[in-house]
Curated annotation (Swiss-Prot):
Positions with biased composition (Acidic residues): 1291-1300
Gene: sca1
Family annotation (InterPro entries): Autotransporte_beta, Autotransporte_beta_dom_sf, OM_autotransptr_brl_dom
Cellular component GO terms, alphabetical: cell outer membrane
Biased segments, Basic and acidic residues type: 110-128, 490-506
Entry keyword Mitochondrion: no
Region (Disordered): 93-265, 490-509, 1146-1169, 1284-1305
Name assigned to this protein: Putative surface cell antigen sca1
Source taxon at top rank: Bacteria
Matching Pfam families: Autotransporter
Length: 1703
């Protein structure tokens, strides 16, 4: 019984699987329609309606099974009858595996997505139908054995595979798919699908259950992977499926069932939200990008293992294609992400509209309209997402197709192979589990899992050999295909080389033929001229003789006879002599004789010429002569010699016997009566055949010419026949008119037959260039020239591409701040780096290679930083000279990063030394013996001193950052120093509390130092960037300050004893410091982990800044509160007069802490002007004064009177700066050198610079220098002295709480934070009234500590969020305020138009027409002219991409002088134009001022045949001033920019002057123009703008000009003469434009904002229209002109007035 059941179940499971496969492969019955529906909501609604309709029809068909008619049966499902089978399940499985064919099974290894959903059911409803989830679509490509998943379905579902094909015949009721509509065409009978519950192990009678295992996707099982997987995918072991197919009249089912099962409508698909769809599209594009990276790595690996350039060439092309596709996918991903954000915003807006308070009808209608509008936008955006996804999939498919053509080498990864356990054994386990207890079921399930794992292991071993064989076979096939492809490519190249040689040879022959044709044409023209002269002389001779005969017989003839004789004379005179092939009249018979005058009647009929000869009334047209390319004149001189004789058919004057009488002689005249049109037609036919034959020979290969041999022979025969007809027409001499008509008809018939045959030949010929027969024979010569030009263009294009292929335009921009995306592909592409003892040269070589690596994006510039750090680790032991030698070998683009990181490593060593110093100090404090403590401190000082000199050198390299290095921890250091110095003595009883306080202070410093050291090391890790190094410099400097304060505190151990009353408050403050140290440690530890993690990003760094600032605020507040404890009892604490205790705010007298007497806190006497500190400070002051003076001189305009003197002073000041810098460094290293410095000399030098410092300011400066010696080095106090000449800034007055003081802004910039209002400072620092007590009470309880910390943290976090928003807004402002777009070009265009009007071509006609030029003098005798022109114009430029447009005005003047000789002009002109451009959408009146100075040289050359050539060359220098206002929070920052622009222009125009009868002149012109514009690097200055730098940009444009001008003469009015109107129009087209990217850096409040501008190219086509009026009075010419210039983004109006005086 068990065997029978097992047999039946196995057969039924096979049938069900085969049926499922058949339904998918025949028409994609379910999968294809659902693909389109999943992309939008409308398709999902269509799916639900269709499923309901299908379920209704199925229920009707099941209910009326007996009453409905049987539809037409196309086919049936054939199910074999059950047979007895005695084989075991394992034997059956082995037989099935052995029967499977590797090549014949097209659906093998194709995973089919699970089309059904598990639905829970009760144990009693085992046999009932289950709900079915509609299947998702999957396209199956049989040929390539790939599966393409639906673009909107990204979830991996369990799949199922069927090993064999079923026997299936499709019936009329099967659902079909309409390709056109992409939807269902469903018949009434749709198969119902039922599913049994996986929770029950019993099955209904006759229902098969197939055990399956879950499918585990392998790394190679990607949709776009070409590697065939031998492993059959597993199926789900928990899902037991049962399918039943039924139709209305059919009784053929899988198993007969006695009970009718009503169909259950399927559950509709759950639509994903728009945001989820966008996220999935981005993930799909990212998957495609990763796949491209893998392919790129495989291609590069194959290239390395391939030998020979010919073999590597297709692989290199494939590599370029993959790299280009990867770049496109990156762009698609970014665009899809942006669209996803927009969709998410719209979706959230819709949700907010749907929810909320109760609304009235008007509000509801408004919300509904907004919802509809948002839904439409979402649909459009989703369509764009779909297109992006399709584009990514298309690129993936193209790469797959290209990869098939080559053999790629990649590591062979064994795919896990699983095996389906036998159905019988699994079924037996199910039957046994039904009767077992719960514990037995658990044991059986565990045993089933063990059996399953064993079966999988056996399957892996069994299939590994087959997998290896399959891989090897595939590699052999691909290798063979690759070799075949290479052979084909090689053959093609050889053929192309041969064809190129043949074309070159043909071109040489063609050039020779053209030269011969020119020679023949010249000879024929000369012969024709001689022949015409001979005809004229012969006609005159005949007329003279006729005149003599007529004088003798005048009296005897009547009027009628005279008229008859006149007609005969006309026929005789008008008869042509002969063609070029006939002989001509002898020169000896052309002698003229004196004759008598004709009678009066004859004279009125026959006119005479100047010499008295008779002239014919009409002149007959000369015969059309065409010289063929293959006809040559053997001896051109023979044509001249042939003129001396006449042919036999022509009689001379002596032979005509005129003396016998006029009417009595019989005269026979021979004429050439053939139609000249036929001759012309024959010539065109011959020329066309010759051209087409040569084109076919040039554009076809030799192998193709062999196949076209018959057609070419026919064309050759037609060519010879046409030549024969042509020669016959030229030589035909016919007497009778009937013969003439017959001959003409026969020749025309032959020509038409030749043309029709030629049409057939050319239509049947298919060449590589797609040559077709041209029906228009009049354009054959034009077509020949065009074909030659096309060949030249193609050759030029090929040469250009070959150059680009050999010298690619690699990206030179190296971004030191990469992201994490795309790094895997680059790392895999570049390969692993060697790690060896001598790897320094290899690293250098690798860096040099990466310098020219074609990066896909800025994200992929991570690799140079990684290699740079590796190189640094190898060169850490080298000396500075050795390291400098290594750095010189590195590429200049990467060398700055290498040297910068070297300096950072040095600073890291200083940090380690300082940490060791702090540790020694702590140990010394804990040591009971004071002698040992002193020794420990001395040892630590020695250890730290080893790096002190190098640290000072490092400071010299960072002068611009010193302020923020030392300003940040200044207040903390002051408070700690004051605290330590305030203790004059310490009693023996208070030693222990004092030790604890010092230990707490040192512990806080050491913890901070160690954490900073760890952070420093993390910054040097590969995941760091140069920006993060700069952002952490403030905190690094804090690390240097803490140990110095600790040394001060340790030095006061033996001081006097303090009072007993301070004991308890000091212990509380120590607890607060301990708390701060623990919080700092935790925060820094979290930050350190986040920085070191590979997945960290810029966002995580920003998020950690809140914690960092939180820690700083706690330390500051605790230090100040700790110091305030002693202020009540001690009178010698050192504090600042201003009470500067907050960021961006100074408290007043009532809010500040008590200020003790400062006299006791001074270390040295402040009145001592000769102290070393004072002298060093004065040296710094003098250095800063020199810098300020130099900057003032540099801001002066270069056009001022003393520009040369200013330049010389600037050079001298720069030399002084260098000298002072070296002197200060030397004094810092050796303080003994300060003895040579004189206070009076420095003060005198300062007086000379205009920056004298008063004595009050110096005393204040000395007091501050005493309290904070480090402030001297950073230069902050010196800057305050220079900014205020009367006294140093002592603090601003108290303002309102919500205002931001300027000092706060400055200090906020120094700390990298925005200035906070007073209320924020009170919350953050807890130093207002009543807050000191709260800070002192931090140690009372843990709850109060946590609350205070939370308050401080929330305040800092809120402030940082505000700061980030304002930085983002600032970045947006900078991106919109683009640099100069084309303002300089606008000025140059205006100037060129003014000069071009002077250079209008003026042909000196005899009718004294209006001068063509704008103000040119009519009289050609004028040699010199002086002219002036004034202009005014407006222009408007629209917004281009993300750059703001502008409106501008231009006004200026031009003066010129030229010399004119016979309408040939040469002159020079100077122009000065002032322009103002105001940027649109600017609330701050931002504008740009340009002063342009242009020098132009122009000329005009008059050419023959009314042509004239104009040329213009100009060079200009533009001085540009930009005035821009930035909004940084509530602060308005005004910046001023001064820089220059150099522009060069050159143009040439060819004019043709055409004069009409009414003195109207039309002048068409054509020409070229080239323009080059170049901006210099500039620095921007302004309030709080520390630095703005703009890299040099350059713009090159080559354009063509085509236009025309019309001059209309007018009548003279008043004293004006030569009045005329001018109209002009021109079209300018840019052929080539080259622009550079602009990198702009703006530094505000110590925050750098970087913006990269890609200057958009100007529109290709521009138009210029103009009109004017011109007139002259005596020697003065006046003209008025107007021009209108426009293109896609730009409009300009310009008017001008010109006055010219002829000298």
């Amino acid at each position: 019984m068990n065997k029978l059941t097992e047999q039946n179940l196995l057969k039924k499971s096979r049938f069900l699987k085969y049926s499922l496969l058949a339904s998918i492969s025949v028409g994609a019955i379910i999968a294809i329609p659902f693909e389109g529906m999943a992309s939008s909501k409308q398709k999902a609604l269509f799916q639900n309606a269709l499923e309901k309709k299908l379920s209704l029809r199925l229920s009707q068909s099941n209910g009326n099974r007996d009453t409905t008619n049987t539809p037409q049966q196309i086919g049936t499902v054939i199910v074999p009858e059950p047979e007895r089978n005695t084989y075991t399940s394992s034997e059956i499985r082995e037989m099935e595996i052995s029967k499977q064919s590797k090549a014949s099974n097209p659906l093998k290894d194709i995973p089919i997505e699970d089309h059904y959903k598990k639905v829970a059911r009760s144990k009693s409803d085992v046999g009932k139908a289950r709900k079915v989830r509609p299947p998702t679509r999957s396209k199956t490509f049989v040929d390539t054995e790939k599966v393409e998943q639906n673009q909107n379905n990204y979830t991996h579902e369990p799949t199922e595979q069927t090993p064999q094909k079923p026997e299936i015949i499709i019936t009329a009721s099967s659902p079909t798919v309409s390709p056109a509509s992409n939807g269902f065409v469903t018949a009434p009978n749709t198969p119902n699908t039922t599913l049994t519950s996986p929770e029950h192990y019993t099955t209904a009678p006759g229902t098969p259950s197939t055990p399956v295992t879950p499918y585990q996707p392998t790394p190679d099982s990607k949709p776009n992977d070409n590697l065939e997987a031998k492993t059959p995918p597993n199926t789900n072991s928990k899902a037991v499926r049962r399918l039943s197919f039924s139709s209305e009249p059919q009784q053929t089912v899988v198993q007969p069932s006695t009970q009718a099962k009503p169909p259950v409508p399927p559950k509709p698909l759950l639509l994903s939200s728009a945001g989820v769809v966008a996220k999935k599209v981005v993930s799909n594009i990212l998957r495609v990008n990763e796949m491209l990276g893998i392919k790129l790595a495989e291609v590069e690996s194959t290239i390395k293992n391939t030998q020979g350039k010919e073999n590597k060439k297709p692989l290199q092309q494939l590599k370029k294609q993959i790299a280009s596709s990867q770049k496109t996918t990156e762009k698609l991903k970014s665009e899809a992400a942006k669209i996803g954000i927009k969709i998410k915003e719209l979706d959230e807006e819709n949700k907010s509209l749907k929810t909320g308070r109760v609304k009235n009808k008007r509000e509801l209608d408004k919300d509904n309209a907004k919802l509809k509008e948002n839904n439409k936008k979402i649909d459009k955006l989703q369509q764009k997402l779909t297109n992006k996804n399709n584009e990514a999939n298309r690129l993936s498919e193209e790469i797959d197709i290209s990869v098939k053509k080559v053999v790629l080498i990649k590591p062979q990864v064994k795919a896990p192979v699983t095996e389906m356990p036998p159905a019988g054994s699994f079924l037996n386990q199910q039957q046994q589990l039904e009767v077992l207890t719960q514990q037995q079921k658990v044991n059986a399930a565990r045993q089933a899992v063990v059996d399953k794992k064993r079966a999988e292991a056996n399957g892996v071993k069994r299939n590994s050999a087959e997998y290896k064989d399959l891989i090897s076979e595939r590699e052999e096939i691909q290798l063979e295909q690759n070799q075949r492809h290479i052979a084909v490519e090689k053959t093609k190249k050889q053929q192309q080389a041969e064809d190129k040689e043949q074309r070159q040879e043909a071109q040489k022959q063609l050039s020779k033929i053209k030269k011969q044709e020119k020679a023949i044409k010249a000879a024929s023209d000369e012969a024709q001229k001689i022949l015409n002269d001979a005809k004229k002389e012969a006609s005159r001779t005949k007329l003279k003789k006729l005149q003599e005969q007529m004088d003798n017989h005048v009296a005897m003839v009547t009027n009628d006879k005279i008229e008859e004789n006149i007609k005969k004379l006309e026929g005789l005179a008008l008869t042509p002599s002969t063609t070029s092939s006939a002989a001509t009249i002898s020169k000896q018979s052309l002698t003229a004789k004196s004759t008598m005058q004709l009678s009066h009647e004859l004279q009125r009929t026959l006119p005479e010429d100047e010499d008295g000869y008779l002239e014919p009334i009409k002149v007959q047209q000369q015969p059309y002569t065409v010289m063929l390319s293959n006809q040559e004149v053997a001896d051109p001189k023979s044509m001249d010699s042939g003129l001396g004789s006449l042919p036999s058919g022509i009689e001379t004057d002596e032979d005509t016997e005129f003396n016998l009488g006029w009417g009595n002689g019989h005269h026979k005249e021979l004429i050439l009566s053939v139609d000249s049109k036929l001759i012309e037609k024959a010539a065109q036919l011959i020329s066309g055949l010759d051209v087409k034959r040569s084109e076919i020979l040039q554009t076809t290969s030799p192998s193709q010419q062999k196949s076209l041999n018959l057609a070419l022979q026919g064309i050759e025969n037609d060519y010879q026949e046409a030549i024969e007809v042509y020669q016959g027409l030229q030589q035909a001499l016919i007497h009778k008119s009937e013969d003439i008509k017959a001959y003409n008809a026969e020749a025309e018939k032959r020509l038409d037959a030749i043309k029709s045959r030629a049409d057939k030949y050319f239509n049947n010929i298919e060449t590589d260039a797609d040559v077709g027969f041209n029906q228009d024979w009049s354009n054959v010569h034009t077509q020949t020239a065009q074909s030659d030009s096309v060949l030249k263009m193609q050759q030029a294009l090929l040469e250009k591409r070959s150059k680009e292929g050999s010298n690619p335009n690699f990206t030179t921009y190296l971004d030191p701040q990469p992201g994490e995306e795309g790094l895997k592909s680059i790392d895999s592409g570049l390969g692993s780096l060697p790690i060896d003892a001598s790897v320094i040269p290899q690293y250098v070589e690798e860096l040099n290679n990466l310098a020219s690596f074609s990066s896909l994006n800025q994200i992929q510039q991570k690799k140079p930083l990684i290699i740079t750090n590796m190189l640094l680790s190898e060169t850490s032991a080298l000396s500075d000279d050795e390291f400098r030698a290594v750095a010189n070998e590195v590429h200049p683009k990467i060398r700055p990063i290498l040297t910068y990181n070297r300096q950072k490593e040095k600073e890291a060593k200083l940090v380690e030394a300082e940490a060791a110093h702090s540790q020694v100090v702590q140990n010394a404090i804990k040591t009971p013996n004071s002698t040992q403590a002193k020794e420990a401190v001395e040892n630590a000082a020695k250890l730290f001193g080893q790096y002190n000199n190098s640290f000072k050198l490092t400071q010299a390299l960072r002068d611009e950052h010193r302020k923020k290095y030392y300003e940040t921890p200044k207040k903390v250091t002051d408070s700690i120093n004051s605290l330590d110095l305030a203790v004059p003595a310490e009693s023996q009883q208070l030693k222990e509390p004092r030790s604890k306080s010092l230990e707490a202070l040192d512990l806080a410093g050491s913890v901070s130092s160690q954490l900073k050291q760890a952070e420093y090391k993390s910054v040097l890790s590969p995941s760091s960037s140069v920006n993060s190094l700069l952002s952490n410099e403030d905190e690094q400097n804090h690390e240097f300050e803490i140990p110095k304060s600790l040394s001060f505190s340790f030095g006061s151990l033996n001081s006097d004893a303090e009072s007993q009353q301070l004991k308890e408050p000091r212990s509380k403050s120590l607890e607060a410091l301990d708390l701060a140290g623990s919080v700092s440690s935790q925060l820094k530890q979290a930050e350190y982990k986040s920085v070191l993690s590979p997945s960290s990003s810029v966002n995580s760094l920003f998020s950690n800044e809140d914690e960092q600032n939180h820690e700083f605020e706690i330390l500051k507040s605790l230090s100040f509160s700790f110091g305030s404890l002693n202020s009540d009892a001690e009178s010698n604490l050192s504090w600042d007069n201003t009470g500067d205790i907050g960021v961006g705010h100074r408290y007043g007298a009532e809010d500040s802490c008590p200020t003790p007497d400062q006299s006791s806190s001074k270390i040295a006497n402040s009145s001592d002007k000769n102290s070393s500190e004072t002298k060093l400070a004065l040296l710094r002051t003098y250095q800063m004064a020199v810098i300020v003076k130099r900057q003032e001189l540099e801001q002066l305009p270069s056009t001022s009177s003393g520009a040369d003197q200013n330049t010389q002073k600037i050079k001298e000041l720069k030399e002084v700066e260098v000298t002072m810098h070296d002197a200060i460094n030397a004094c810092i290293a050796d303080s003994s050198k300060l003895n040579d410095v004189s206070f009076e000399e420095i003060n005198e030098a300062l007086k000379k610079l205009g920056s004298e410092i008063p004595e009050s300011a110096i005393s204040d400066f000395e007091s501050k220098a005493q309290k904070d010696p480090e402030a001297i080095l950073d230069g902050s106090i010196l800057q305050e002295m220079l900014s205020s000449k009367d006294s140093l800034p002592s603090g601003d007055e108290e303002q309102e709480d919500t205002e931001v003081t300027e000092s706060g802004i400055q200090k906020a910039g120094d700390k990298g934070l925005l200035a906070l209002p007073v209320s924020s400072n009170e919350c953050a620092l807890a130093l207002s009234d009543g807050r000191e007590k709260e800070c002192l009470a931090l140690g009372d309880g843990s709850e109060e500590k946590e609350e205070t910390i939370e308050q401080l943290s929330d305040s800092v976090e809120g402030n940082l969020k505000i700061e980030q928003e304002e930085k983002k807004e600032m970045q947006t402002q900078i991106s919109k305020n683009a640099p100069t777009l084309n303002q300089a070009k606008v000025v140059n265009t205006i100037v060129n138009n003014m000069i071009r009007n002077r250079l209008d071509a003026s042909m000196n006609m005899s009718n004294n027409m209006v001068a063509v030029g704008a103000g040119d003098e009519e009289e050609s005798r004028i040699k010199r002219g002086l002219w002036m022109r004034g202009m005014y114009g407006t222009n408007n430029h629209g917004r281009v991409e993300n750059m703001t447009g502008y409106r501008g005005t231009n006004k200026g003047a031009t003066i010129g002088f030229d010399v004119e000789i016979d309408n040939n002009i040469l002159g020079i002109a100077y122009s000065n134009v002032h322009s103002v451009f105001k940027f649109k959408n600017s609330k701050n009146n931002d504008k740009e001022l340009i002063d342009s100075h242009v020098v132009s040289i122009y000329g005009q050359k008059e050419l023959p045949r009314n042509f004239a050539l104009q040329a213009l060359v100009s060079a200009s220098k533009n001085f540009i001033k930009d005035k821009t206002t930035y909004s940084y929070g509530d602060t308005k920052i005004r910046s001023n920019v001064k820089h220059s622009n150099h522009s060069y222009n050159a143009e040439a125009l060819l004019n043709y002057n055409y004069l009409l009868q009414n003195k109207l002149v039309i002048t068409p012109n054509i020409g070229l123009r080239y323009g080059k514009s170049r901006d210099g690097v500039y620095n921007e200055t302004g309030i709080n703008v520390q630095e703005i730098a703009l890299t040099m940009k350059e713009n090159n444009i080559l354009s063509g000009i085509v236009g025309t001008k019309v001059k209309v003469p007018l009548k003279d009015v008043l004293k004006f003469n030569n009045l005329g109107l001018t109209f002009q129009g021109a079209v300018e087209h840019n052929f080539k434009e080259k622009t550079q990217r602009i990198n702009r850096v703006v530094k505000i409040f110590d925050t750098e904002f970087k913006q990269n501008y890609a200057i958009p190219k100007q529109p290709k086509t521009s138009y210029n229209l103009g009109t004017g009026i011109i007139g002259s009075i005596k020697n003065t010419t006046i003209s008025l002109d107007y021009n209108y210039y426009l293109n896609k983004h730009y409009r300009s109006h310009q008017g001008s007035v010109k006055l010219k005086v002829n000298l």
